[in-house]
């Protein structure tokens, strides 16, 4: 019989909130008897925006802004029914996007 995996992918703009949510998921999975692989840090996506500082002239004077999207990957190997139930009830911080694949 093939073992079942749960793959969890987390995204957030703030890496501290992302790491805290990752720790909560890992602790919950280990507490219910599942094996956890990860967290694996994935490459951060950096979006840069350049705008003119002045609304009228001075095209050479510009300002740059950036948004960094940090990502983590977790694999839960052979989850028990208690693991799935505990993960469904888990309340993560606001600002963390969670994608789950079975």
Swiss-Prot record:
Keyword Ribosomal protein: yes
InterPro entries, per database record: Ribosomal_uS10 (IPR001848), Ribosomal_uS10_dom (IPR027486), Ribosomal_uS10_dom_sf (IPR036838)
Entry's Gene Ontology cellular component terms: ribonucleoprotein complex; ribosome
Cysteine disulfide partners in this protein: none
Keywords, sorted A to Z: Ribonucleoprotein, Ribosomal protein
Pfam families: Ribosomal_S10 (PF00338)
Gene Ontology process terms (BP): translation
A GO molecular function held by the record: tRNA binding
Source domain of life: Bacteria
Subunit-level organization: Part of the 30S ribosomal subunit.
NCBIfam families noted in UniProt: PRK00596.1 (NF001861), rpsJ_bact (TIGR01049)
Family: Belongs to the universal ribosomal protein uS10 family.
Role played: Involved in the binding of tRNA to the ribosomes.
PANTHER family reported in the protein's UniProt record: 30S RIBOSOMAL PROTEIN S10 FAMILY MEMBER
HAMAP family: Ribosomal_uS10
Protein name: Small ribosomal subunit protein uS10
